[in-house]
Amino acid sequence: MDAGPLLELGLAANGTVEVPSVADGNRIGWYTKAVTPGETGPAVLIGHFDTARGPAVLRNVSKIRTGDEITVSRADGTTAVFRVRELEQVDKKNFPTAKVYGNTARPELRVITCGGEITEGHRPDNIIVYADLVG
């Protein structure tokens, strides 16, 4: 998986992490309050599985497997390569905040999207990919 050019995401007015707009459904966002991909700590990327317009950038998340590589092009022209260590699907009400955003001793990556069957117009779960820097 290649993350492509990243959108910059911050915090929404309600204090939650921003997500890309529907218009940017085919782009992945980088949560700028976390570290830059490749730096020590968890870098966090967020993208849509789908939107009202149809499939989005992370529509193939179900094909990601442990051991797969994720390539992130950095603003400084270098590339960070991560290897998937774990995939997790959780109810949004039980989001593992400390596991996703907590400090780590090495460069790590989190990729977050929505999952589960649509209920009342929304997907109730988050799918989280955890990966470690390998190059």
Predicted segments — roles?
Residues 1-65, 74-76, 86-135:
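Solvent-exposed, non-transmembrane regions of membrane-associated and secreted proteins
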